[in-house]
């Protein structure tokens, strides 16, 4: 990192301190804000032109660097598989099952450099069959695995509980006299929309003491984070849980090693004859070096194996999006597109967010007075047809074609998993939902084939009829109660498993049918992020923090904190600017691999809009590279903040520095 940083930091800081802006272009007009921001690039001269579009697809020449780490990880895996203690565990009829007595068969195959492992365990009575399927990646010191459990008998199985798909001891040298575990708070810990989403949490692992984590009420990153690092002496692990529901993970020190257990939080069920269930998936990355190095290996892993490919077979490109609630008519949206094209603002995408299905009426100017009220867009979920007062044709086809001619895609918001009593879906298709409701809220039962097929057909029609480039699926409810109350206690967990499997099936089917269409996963912001979701979707709205009132309970410094904290783990995510202005400090606070901003571009703000969006476009590819926290993320109004994004394959990067309102002149 230091070698890379030396290439750009000295000239950039010199320019920053002299001019307040290190870009080669003319900066936008000065704002009244006393705070300033700088974003600088190490490219753009005549001899060194700006990076081109294909630079969104990084090439990683890192296999040699990983050889020793991959070898050590493979030996750990062999040690675990060859031991009497299996790498998973369960209780049967409330007693710990001794799986070491089960018959075990392990096979390995190699394809494209990856090593595929199948470990099959059969209980002595030949009634339960457990299959551990693992992949040891050729291009990363990482193993990915899942356990499936099947009842192969002709009668119900014993009650299965405490099924940990990962129950392992990993040998690491200690960091001093202990291991250190890091994770984050997840999304929404302090409230529905809070500045410290994804703030780092650090713990010591102690013998005989379990440190336990699980999310809130069924969304995988709601007040918890299914990603962890465990640090030893100049080495460590990155552990990820792949379950978009109610997972559980716990960590401890045991016999000078790290003990890890993880599975579903709520499981107490028998299996019917022939019935099969699965555990969460898991990813373990081993690294040698400091935590920053390990996290950059993990970011590269996410790009290589846990990011959806577009039809070009490359890692996806997050858009620069004009974004708005559906609080205006199609004519006004068309004028927004026309203005962006007229003034040369390099917009990729127009996001039409919630409200297009409500019964609101626009004023004579085509705008809904006061925008879409919360009680409209929220409680009318389930009326999934276009408001013809806003969209006279009952679709977006004309709007999408006009946008496409100007090189702009269209994204549309939908929240199909939730519906309210009194809406079309509940009045006409209540059989597709869970049998219980909560305060008029209903949850689509994706464990039912007919519900899955309805949703696939509806999304498919939405994409085709409206020529969508991005489909945004939101999820503004907590599903755990619905899952846990669908069946008797001796079938606890089955509804959740079938629901999560159904969710993945829907996303996989849509991805297969429309490989050029991105699925944007939103869940009250970023409350459903895990490796299974990341494999299938992108995160274009990482938090609802910027839905708050600017200057009251939303500040640019919070956006900066979230960007720096989340980027330590994941490379691809985006957020909203949060205001209707194009002001440099505010806009640059939201810089990331993608960005959402005001759709009202006019002669008055066109110069600033073009400058800032163009700068975001030029910087965007660097976020696909390695990430370095130059200064530790802090939420305040007096510090400097700085981070670097660096593309080793290009030998180029960017340094972003924020000088906050009450900051001292030097740092």
Show the residue positions of the predicted features:
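Conserved, mostly hydrophobic/aromatic
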Residues: 147, 274, 350, 403, ...
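Polysaccharide-binding surfaces and accessory modules of carbohydrate-active proteins
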Residues: 44-251, 265, 667
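N-terminal, intrinsically disordered, polar/charged segments of Gram-positive cell-envelope systems
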Residues: 26-48
